[in-house]
Amino acid sequence: MPNRKASRNAYYFFVQEKIPELRRRGLPVARVADAIPYCSSDWALLREEEKEKYAEMAREWRAAQGKDPGPSEKQKPVFTPLRRPGMLVPKQNVSPPDMSALSLKGDQALLGGIFYFLNIFSHGELPPHCEQRFLPCEIGCVKYSLQEGIMADFHSFINPGEIPRGFRFHCQAASDSSHKIPISNFERGHNQATVLQNLYRFIHPNPGNWPPIYCKSDDRTRVNWCLKHMAKASEIRQDLQLLTVEDLVVGIYQQKFLKEPSKTWIRSLLDVAMWDYSSNTRCKWHEENDILFCALAVCKKIAYCISNSLATLFGIQLTEAHVPLQDYEASNSVTPKMVVLDAGRYQKLRVGSSGFSHFNSSNEEQRSNTPIGDYPSRAKISGQNSSVRGRGITRLLESISNSSSNIHKFSNCDTSLSPYMSQKDGYKSFSSLS
């Protein structure tokens, strides 16, 4: 069998360049073949002129190997896993949004700024070699500001079109494990062109510059691809500036506090479950069917998390438009019955109940002799004059310790114990037995 060395194309050199970054992220990539599955989405977002750099590297490698490309090889297009000829592919933008315009007017401009949070669900993700990577089935978007909270929302189900041959089971399994939207014959699904036009009217009702749109960084590849796919299907060409919510929060913190929070903290801020089942968060269909995954709910929970974290720092009073107040107040309240500071606190509560009234007078007398000093109001100070703490066995052990110097007198404890416990006029500590 001949020992032929595989040819290297532009995609090979792109993956080779990404390997150090993948290793820094902790991914198990030892060679190019291991890194290929992690690079297909990034490759699809490159523009044609950016891919030309790697194509030139491939030509130089072939020339060095003595493999000048023939006529058929020169005409062969560079393999693009996610790109269809003529489809608009955006340039990946991972830099934080420009907040300099807001800095000129201070906090008021930042509080009044309008942000749009967008998410698009799909019936799973098809393998990289497929021309159609996603099948959009649901879209959600909210209009939000720090001052007003959620001002408006947009939601629609999308007709995904024809399921690629051989992937029906794959798409059905992906749907059943998440949003549970039927993959076919769903009467609520709308034409992709109609949905995209309605989305454009929602985010850009008046002439002028288009506002930036934000989504989670983990969803950006899917949302970007679906927008361009729907734009091509409807022949509507409009470049939307799709940024990440994480970068938005970084920009707000830098503008307000001149500090940059860590991306790990921001992701933990956005990935919370306290509003998963809050009322008026999911769409009507997911709410009625008690399904957790909803594109509109993802957008609203982003707004809730930002309000919960940033609104109080700007001195904004939270309203129903910022967070679901009934769930917010419940999550911040504490049931008094579950709070037991210490045994003394627990016993103090029992003293006031029936059956312990004969302890009141002596307890008040002992508490009046307790030095306060600089200790907190609920702190207990050990010593001979401190208030009674803990259970009876604790007091007995303390009395034994205090009377260790007079141990010969403690032998009479059994005979003198009964008279002290039978007295009706109050309570005397065991330390008096000595």
From Swiss-Prot:
DNA-binding region in chain numbering: 4-73
Chief location: cytoplasm
Keywords associated with the record: Cytoplasm, Developmental protein, Differentiation, DNA-binding, Meiosis, Nucleus, RNA-mediated gene silencing, Spermatogenesis
Annotated Gene Ontology cellular component terms: autosome; chromatin; chromatoid body; cytoplasm; male germ cell nucleus; nucleus; P granule; perinuclear region of cytoplasm
Origin: domain of life: Eukaryota
Annotated GO MF terms: sequence-specific DNA binding
Compartments, as annotated in UniProt: Cytoplasm; Nucleus
Tissues showing expression: Testis-specific. Expressed in various cancer cell lines, probably due to demethylation of its promoter.
Pfam families reported in the protein's UniProt record: HMG_box_2, Maelstrom
Subunit composition and interactions: Interacts with SMARCB1, SIN3B and DDX4. Interacts with piRNA-associated proteins TDRD1, PIWIL1 and PIWIL2. Interacts with TEX19.
Annotated function: Plays a central role during spermatogenesis by repressing transposable elements and preventing their mobilization, which is essential for the germline integrity. Acts via the piRNA metabolic process, which mediates the repression of transposable elements during meiosis by forming complexes composed of piRNAs and Piwi proteins and governs the methylation and subsequent repression of transposons. Its association with piP-bodies suggests a participation in the secondary piRNAs metabolic process. Required for the localization of germ-cell factors to the meiotic nuage.
Protein name: Protein maelstrom homolog
The organism of origin for this protein: Homo sapiens (Human)
Organism classification: Eukaryota, Metazoa, Chordata, Craniata, Vertebrata
